[in-house]
Amino acid sequence: MNYEFGRESGFINSQPSLAECLTSLSNPVGDAFQSSSIKSSALSPSTLIPPPFEQTVIGLNPGTHPRHSRSKQSSPEAIDVGPGGGTSRRLRTAYTNTQLLELEKEFHFNKYLCRPRRVEIAALLDLTEKQVKVWFQNRRMKHKRQTHCKENRDSEGKYACLDDEPEDEFEQEAGGSVAATLLERERQFQQNQFTSQQCLNGNNGESQSLSAALLNSNEKNLKHFPNVAPTVPNCASTIEADNRHSPGLDLPLQDFPVFSPSSFSPSFSDSTESSLPLSSETFDLFSETLTTIDLQNLSY
């Protein structure tokens, strides 16, 4: 009766004590409750707890249950399979050639579509409005990248041209400066030759002019030489006798431009009028003196 009452009370309370469980399992014949409790306290719990109770006690800790351990081991596989299988990713829309052609035509004329036009194109091409919208967004980004890359290439080409141009200009300037120096040297050489020729010609001309002037002066002096003799009228016969080869001795004294009768002093005229005899040597000395005076006057 006590055993049955204990089991009923255990099921009613639903929280049986450890002593009642040990009593019901160790003494099924029907020992007293006190004796069974004393005996169970003296025994070790490892020898008295059956395997089903160990499983129930172990089951109270969810972390050590094998079912939970298997679920924990399989969860990484599910995480790994998820991204690999691609079930979570959105499927990419596959456009046909006709759809792409029509979309490219529309993008060529209109890069931004209004909603009515987008709905119309989606109905014509058997697409959804969202698909058309996404395609135009992607196409605008692609066009922007292409334009940006093209601008970068053009700018790099321009910078390269600008970098190359100064070198070419420097080379051209260097070549031009060398050619200019060569031309300048050649021109200076030609000018030096021309000036040297002019100097030579000028020297020749001066020498010729000097020689011509000297000849003219000599001729004039030679012309004036015979006119000196008639300064002494009393000695005309001796001059004619000595210098018959000169035809200018017959000229009168008045035609001689240098000497005039008024230029003679009275003493000299008196001396000429006197009948003093003059030798030919004295007369020659006198005529030479007069000719030297005449040459000095002509030179100055």
From Swiss-Prot:
Q: Where in the cell is it found?
A: Nucleus
Name the InterPro entries on file.
HD, HD_metazoa, Homeobox_CS, Homeodomain-like_sf
Where the protein is mainly located, per its record?
nucleus
What's a single GO CC term here?
Answer: nucleus
Q: Which SUPFAM superfamilies match?
A: Homeodomain-like (SSF46689)
The record's region (Disordered) falls at 59-90
Q: Name one Pfam family in it.
A: Homeodomain
- Which sections of the sequence are annotated for DNA binding? 88-147
For this UniProt entry, the molecular function terms from Gene Ontology, in alphabetical order, are:
DNA-binding transcription factor activity, RNA polymerase II-specific; RNA polymerase II cis-regulatory region sequence-specific DNA binding
Q: Which UniProt keywords apply?
A: Developmental protein, DNA-binding, Homeobox, Nucleus, Transcription, Transcription regulation
Q: Which PROSITE patterns does the protein's record reference?
A: HOMEOBOX_1 (PS00027), HOMEOBOX_2 (PS50071)
Superkingdom is Eukaryota
Function text: Sequence-specific transcription factor which is part of a developmental regulatory system that provides cells with specific positional identities on the anterior-posterior axis.
Family that this chain belongs to = Belongs to the Antp homeobox family. Proboscipedia subfamily.
What is the designated name of this protein? Homeobox protein Hox-A2b
Native source organism of the sequence? Takifugu rubripes (Japanese pufferfish)
The gene designation is hoxa2b
